[in-house]
Amino acid sequence: MTLKLTDIVLTYPDGDRTLTALDHVDLAVAPGEFTAVVGPSGSGKSSLLAVAATLITPTSGTVSVAGREVSAMTQAARTRVRRDHVGIVFQQANLLPSLTALDQLLVVAHLAGGSPRAAAARARELLLSVDLCGKEHKRPHQMSGGERQRVNIARALMNEPEVLLVDEPTSALDHERGERVVSLLAELTRRNDLATVMVTHDLGSLSAVDMVLTMRDGRLTAGDIRGVHSAG
């Protein structure tokens, strides 16, 4: 498995209490597999994504990314794993307002080092793959919400990750644009052999995913998504 979380527990102190954000969670995602995690606000979805991204260390359990067990690594080592093997699509695109679509991607490549010529070729290829051909010189204010989100996705793929983690990609989009973004994620997952995890509350955008998991009260279960909204 490209991404594997085993018996993950994540707790936080809250005064004289201990809050459990993740309660013995297991998750395994293979290359080319697109998994969606749905659940109400406060159910633990964001915590799950943060643990998978190596942004926070679980209280107990193990995290394996691209065959590397990262739970016991130093912060510097986890950062290298995240940079080299994980792409993250944040809920808000957070594009730099003064940069064109092409330059948004080139900034990522510059931070990682490598050949500027190869980076430019990679960036143009990615913009083509997310249906932004001819729009590489547009700035964020000149793009629609769907176009900005596609730049966000392309940016996450710039360093050729094996794991793609996606946080609420349709939250700022109407239904039609949201469906297009999720279909694009499914296509990119298969084309690039990615292990993709998307957390979402949008039950209307799940037709393109391979597996749907439900999170409630920090527990992850397969299948039944009834009551996801009402539970929140």
Model-derived segments and spans:
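Conserved beta-strand-loop-alpha-helix hinge in the C-terminal portion
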Residues: 219-232
